[in-house]
């Protein structure tokens, strides 16, 4: 505390306090800044008390002086009264006091009175200050005591809380230990059960395999036996033919001998010599051609599909030999069965022949060769950028902000269902964007997007990090060998953690330039637009480094990004032009479909007359809906396009039939036991990519017990013929973003068909999965509900051996199955014949209760045996 603060607290002037401090022997240099120590404050207080006492003493002395003066004046007055006359005379004779002296006396008196009053005020102020200080100290001590009390209470409460937490933690640990022991026991039981099932399954498979091998060996023996019979019959036929020829010649020789009787002996000798020569020649020929010295290796020209009989003829072997070889390879075939090129080449190589694979698409190769010669007028083209990433990480929202349109609201559930292609003009240049879906079911569509792109922008949410589809997108980008730019989205959220994203991506091999890698990172927000300009700049920088070029004229080439069937416009294909120019009126070949371009539209629906490289367009006029990913090329005329399309359709049909026949017998053996249930489905969707994604996802749900059988797929609305096919096959129709026609709806209502509409793919997957779970046979689990110990055995003429028991645990039920255990070994399984308590028949007996029971068809119950009662519970199985 400084001097000024102390003076203010004591309510005295600073000068007076300085006088007191100097009288106390304390040196002060700065009134405002010098701080008084506690010892100095005590010394000042003591000096002020001493000064107060001194002042009081002086005051008392002054009062006594005044009193004596007053007494003397009274005596003088009396004397004056007695001597009035003399006094008057003396007063008149005395010298008078001047006014100046009187004023001085009055001033001195007033000064003394003021000094006394000031001292009294100072003393009073000092006492008040001391009282205030004492009161403040008392309040401070009270607050300190109260604070210490609160701290003690807080410490005590914290100790109680810690004790409660420790007790709760111990209780939780005990519960966790009990739960783990229970789970371990259940896991052990499940493992034993699974082991038994596995052993039974392996045993069944071994039996089936042995049976199949036995049938195969029997078939091989039948073929060999048939061949031996054929060879024996052929040999017998040759011998009989020779014998007939030999007999007829001898007859003719005999006749000639009779006619020429003079030369009979010479004729017989000539005939015998001639016959011996023919016999030797026949023997030599037979030995030379029946058993070749070395196998003959021939060059076999194998087309894309060939029957078993035609392949055997080309190799100059019997069809039975070829069938036998395929049986040894594990395939059961017939002589008229179609083989694909790969299988035929494998068989030819196995039988020691050389093969040449033929291509029957010379016209197609000629068209492709003409298109590849288009190398003139090369210009810089816009980069094709594919937006990839996990579902709900903001891919479409990011592209939506760049395009300044609302697309997400139009997607079902805010999830992109198929690839969208957009051409965006920015201040820095033109960029073509492909927006791919992030749901797990659309793997094939993301792979197509990576294959037709120049740059992949991987969108990762800053608050979610790396997810399964993020990893898959990285793999697609690496497989396509395209550069990867990472856009860390949702940076406007408080929980955004870009460092975590960089760390997780580095584990997948995507390392940012900040960490010494080669991948560009942009931190953006699709909601606020933060970092969008930086992302576009990095895309264009990467495009400049790639030096993207394409022919600006000549034959147009591209790829089908997506296709659908529009009710009013027919087949509509989204095509990305990669080189050359596509014009309205050109003849186009897209996969197995062809047609003349009737109209070309951009992403905004504006009609175009022509489209150059890196331009996405919607094309109308094809004969059908091509598959997503099919190559597109402009052909010279419609006749040539039709020939190539028909050739491709025929070959696709042959290959499909060959593959179906290849697995037909295997499926027959697998389904012979009739244990596999099937869920038959028909899939109709709006675009080809959704059909593929939905079909692939549903096929992956198949198990050993329940299989998904997709009888047909297609795009467009559901027609009456679709419903008839579904009804004939007892199939459920999955309608994805399409609707049924009026006739089809009426037929479904009349016949009771099953039609389901979906707009989000995982809802369809979940419903089919639930239907498949309903076809799974439930798991039967045995739960022990009671245990009793046999204390005595009684013999009854009516019931045989009756066991007197006491229920140790749970309860015994009369109608539940039981086991008889002796030394913890099951010696009998059956059911109770009777259950009594005293003389009354009861349905159940609980723990701690005695009872008598009889085991049906079992009389060897002994004292010490245990009766275990259990029940079988059906548990619904999950896929």
UniProtKB/Swiss-Prot annotation:
Domain tr-type G: 380-549
Biased composition (Low complexity): 164-173
Ranges for region G4: 489-492
Chain segments carrying region Disordered: 45-216, 228-293
Predominant cellular place of this UniProt entry's protein: cytoplasm
Residue numbers spanned by region G3: 435-438
GO molecular function, one term: GTP binding
Segments for region (G2): 414-418
Record region (G5): 525-527
Residue spans crossing the bilayer: none
Disulfide bonding pattern of the chain: none
Protein name: Translation initiation factor IF-2
Record lineage: Bacteria, Pseudomonadati, Pseudomonadota, Gammaproteobacteria, Cardiobacteriales
């Amino acid at each position: 505390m400084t001097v000024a603060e102390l003076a203010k607290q004591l309510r005295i002037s600073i000068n007076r306090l300085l006088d007191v401090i100097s009288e106390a022997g304390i040196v002060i240099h700065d009134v405002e800044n010098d701080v008084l120590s506690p010892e100095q404050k005590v010394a000042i207080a003591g000096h002020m008390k001493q000064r107060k006492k001194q002042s009081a003493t002086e005051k008392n002395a002054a009062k006594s002086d005044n009193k004596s003066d007053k007494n003397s004046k009274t005596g003088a007055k009396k004397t004056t009264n007695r001597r009035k006359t003399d006094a008057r005379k003396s007063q008149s004779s005395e010298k008078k006091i001047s006014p100046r002296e009187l004023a001085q006396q009055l001033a001195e008196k007033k000064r003394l009175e003021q000094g006394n009053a000031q001292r009294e005020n100072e003393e009073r102020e000092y006492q008040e200050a001391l009282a205030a200080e004492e009161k403040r100290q008392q309040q401070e001590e009270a607050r300190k005591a109260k604070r210490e009390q609160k701290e003690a209470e807080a410490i005590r409460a914290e100790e109680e809380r810690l004790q409660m937490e420790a007790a709760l933690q111990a209780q939780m640990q005990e519960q966790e230990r009990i739960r783990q022991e229970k789970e371990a026991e259940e896991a052990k039981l499940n493992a034993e059960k699974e082991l038994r099932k596995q052993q039974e399954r392996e045993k069944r498979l071994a039996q089936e395999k042995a049976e199949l091998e036995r049938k195969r060996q029997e078939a091989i023996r039948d073929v060999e036996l048939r061949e031996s019979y054929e060879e024996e019959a052929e040999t017998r036929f040759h011998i009989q033919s020779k014998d007939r020829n030999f007999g007829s010649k001898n007859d003719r020789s005999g006749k000639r001998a009779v006619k020429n009787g003079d030369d009979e002996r010479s004729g017989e000798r000539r005939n015998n010599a001639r016959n011996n020569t023919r016999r030797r020649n026949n023997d030599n020929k037979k030995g030379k051609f029946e058993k070749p010295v070395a196998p003959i290796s021939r060059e076999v020209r194998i087309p894309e599909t060939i029957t078993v009989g035609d392949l055997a003829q080309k190799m100059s072997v019997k069809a039975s030999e070829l069938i036998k070889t395929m049986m040894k390879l594990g395939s059961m075939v017939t002589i008229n069965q179609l083989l694909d090129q790969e299988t035929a080449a494998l068989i030819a190589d196995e039988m020691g022949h050389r093969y040449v694979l033929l291509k029957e698409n010379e016209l197609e190769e000629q068209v492709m060769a003409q298109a590849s010669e288009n190398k003139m007028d090369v210009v810089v083209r816009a980069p094709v950028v594919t937006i990839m990433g996990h579902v709900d990480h903001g891919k479409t929202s990011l592209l939506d902000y760049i395009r300044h349109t609302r697309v997400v609201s139009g997607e079902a559930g805010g999830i992109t269902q198929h690839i969208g292609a957009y051409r965006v003009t920015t201040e820095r240049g033109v960029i073509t964007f492909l927006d791919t879906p992030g749901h797990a079911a659309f793997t094939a569509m993301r792979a197509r997007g990576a294959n037709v792109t120049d740059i992949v922008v991987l969108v990762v949410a800053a608050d979610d990090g790396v997810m399964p589809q993020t990893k898959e997108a990285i793999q697609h980008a690496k497989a396509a060998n395209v550069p990867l730019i990472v856009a860390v989205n949702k940076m406007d959220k408080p929980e955004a953690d870009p460092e975590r994203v960089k760390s997780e991506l580095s584990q997948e091999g995507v390392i940012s330039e900040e960490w010494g890698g080669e991948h560009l990172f942009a931190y953006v927000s699709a909601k606020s637009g933060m970092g969008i300009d930086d992302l576009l700049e990095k895309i264009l920088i990467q495009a400049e480094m790639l030096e993207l070029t394409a022919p600006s004229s000549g034959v147009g080439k591209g790829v089908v990004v997506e296709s659908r069937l529009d009710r009013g416009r027919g087949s509509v294909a989204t095509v990305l032009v990669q080189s050359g120019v596509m014009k309205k009126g050109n003849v186009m070949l897209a996969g197995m479909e062809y047609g003349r371009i009737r109209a070309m539209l951009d992403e905004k629906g504006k009609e175009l007359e022509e489209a150059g490289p890196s331009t996405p367009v919607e094309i109308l006029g094809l004969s059908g809906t091509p598959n997503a990913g099919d190559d597109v090329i402009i052909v010279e005329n419609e006749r040539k396009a039709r020939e190539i399309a028909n050739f491709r359709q025929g070959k696709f049909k042959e290959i499909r039939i060959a593959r179906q026949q290849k697995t037909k017998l295997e499926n027959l053996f697998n389904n012979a036991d009739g244990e596999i249930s099937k869920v038959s489905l028909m899939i109709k969707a709006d675009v080809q990519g959704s059909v593929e994604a939905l079909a692939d996802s549903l096929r992956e749900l198949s198990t050993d017990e329940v299989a998904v059988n997709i009888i047909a797929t297609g795009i467009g609305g559901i027609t009456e013929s679709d419903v008839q096919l579904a009804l004939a096959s007892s199939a459920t129709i999955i309608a994805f973003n399409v609707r049924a026609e009026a006739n089809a709806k009426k037929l479904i209502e009349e016949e009771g068909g099953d039609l389901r509409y979906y707009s989000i793919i995982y809802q369809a997957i979940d419903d089919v999965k639930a239907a498949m779970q309903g076809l799974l046979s439930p798991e039967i689990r045995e739960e022990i509900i009671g245990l009793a110990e046999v204390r005595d055995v009684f013999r009854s003429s009516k019931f045989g051996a009756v066991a007197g028991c006491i229920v140790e645990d749970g309860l015994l039920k009369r109608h539940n199955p039981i086991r008889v255990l002796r030394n913890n070994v099951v010696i009998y399984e059956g059911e109770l014949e009777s259950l009594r308590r005293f003389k009354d028949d009861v349905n159940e007996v609980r723990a701690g209760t005695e009872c008598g029971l009889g085991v049906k068809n079992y009389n060897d119950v002994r004292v010490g045996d245990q009766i275990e009662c259990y029940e079988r519970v059906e548990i619904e199985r999950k896929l």
